[in-house]
UniProtKB/Swiss-Prot annotation:
Tagged with keyword rRNA-binding: yes
Gene3D superfamilies the record matches: 3.30.300.20, Ribosomal protein S3, C-terminal domain (3.30.1140.32)
Positions with biased composition (Basic and acidic residues): 219-238
Encoding gene, per UniProt annotation: rpsC
GO MF entries: mRNA binding; rRNA binding; structural constituent of ribosome
NCBIfam families in UniProt: rpsC_bact
Lineage: Bacteria, Pseudomonadati, Pseudomonadota, Betaproteobacteria, Burkholderiales
SMART domains hit by this protein: KH (SM00322)
Pfam families: KH_2 (PF07650), Ribosomal_S3_C (PF00189)
Name under which the protein is recorded: Small ribosomal subunit protein uS3
Length: 293
């Protein structure tokens, strides 16, 4: 199950949040969703060289707020903010409402799944060996704090006639664990031999809730230990008998008595008289009852 399903959709409302956050009734929902898809396609094509990781779209009260997560915010903003102003006007004309655009910088693009996939596809389009590009990306991700990474490429690798799939993994990638923070990204490389698809899974650790906070384990309180008394052999030991317990039963209380009786020792009390049982044995008879003499 966890190996096949989309990692982000599998964790929605558990440890992941939606990329489009707004509410609409049944009449307007389809149209607004189509607008979101067109806006994402437009931004993907326009900001192709800006290393865009993800796009968040919000629609509060007849407005729109779009947050762009990019590893190169300077490319999105442009000189003196000219590009960002033109981008706001274009998005406002497409959505029909005032649009506010926020730019968030991605601090570590080496452990972002989408940016890793885009970087590998750019190298494949420049005729770089796919194994070298994949292993280099894995080494950079593990060096900068990723706990696990898996990269899969499929298509006519190295220009061979028969398409195949190859994947490499380093560390651990628990796809079925809901609390695991799995970043997933895809990309496509358009080469002269055909299209090569890239899939990247990055495991960044465990999270609590949808705030992407690191999981903090609360230490268990140490058990209270009672002071230990001296042991029988003189070494310092522990008094294993609990406080308030009665005297222990003597060893061998249920053992068979030495006199051969079938009652446990001490069952009749100290004043009881011990009765010894004697087994009666018949005397052997003579050969002719004494008449043979």
């Amino acid at each position: 199950m966890g190996q096949k399903i989309h990692p982000t959709g599998f964790r929605l409302a558990v440890s992941r949040n939606w990329a489009s956050r707004w509410y609409a009734n049944n009449r307007d929902f389809a149209g607004m969703l189509a607008e979101d898809i067109k806006v994402r396609e437009y931004l993907k094509a326009k900001l192709k060289n800006a290393a865009v990781s993800r796009i968040l779209i919000e629609r509060p009260a007849k407005n729109a707020r779009i947050t762009i997560y990019s590893a190169r915010p300077g490319v999105v903003i442009g000189k003196k903010g000219e590009d960002i102003e033109n981008l706001k006007k274009e998005l406002a004309s497409r959505l029909g409402v005032p649009v506010a655009v926020n730019i968030e910088e991605v601090r570590k693009p080496e452990i972002d799944a989408k940016l890793i996939a885009d970087s590998i596809t750019q190298q494949l389009e420049k005729r770089i060996m796919f194994r070298r590009a994949m292993k280099r990306a894995m080494q950079n991700a593990m060096r900068l704090g990723a706990q696990g990474i898996k990269i899969m490429s499929s298509g006519r690798l190295n220009g061979i006639e028969i398409a195949r799939t190859e994947w490499y993994r380093e560390g651990r990638v628990p796809l079925h664990t809901l609390r695991a923070d799995i970043d997933y990204g895809t990309s496509e490389a358009f080469t002269t031999y055909g299209v090569i698809g890239l899939k990247v899974w990055v495991y960044k650790g465990d999270t609590l809730g949808r705030n992407d906070l690191p999981a903090v384990e609360t230490p268990r309180p140490e058990e209270e230990r009672r002071p230990r008394g001296p042991r029988r052999d003189g070494r310092p030991g522990g008094d294993r008998a609990g406080a308030g317990r009665g005297p222990r039963r003597p060893m061998g209380g249920n053992a068979a008595p030495a006199d051969g009786s079938d009652k446990p020792a001490g069952a009749g009390g100290t004043d009881a008289t011990a009765v010894k049982r004697v087994r009666k044995v018949d005397a052997p008879a003579t050969a002719a009852d004494g008449k043979g003499e």
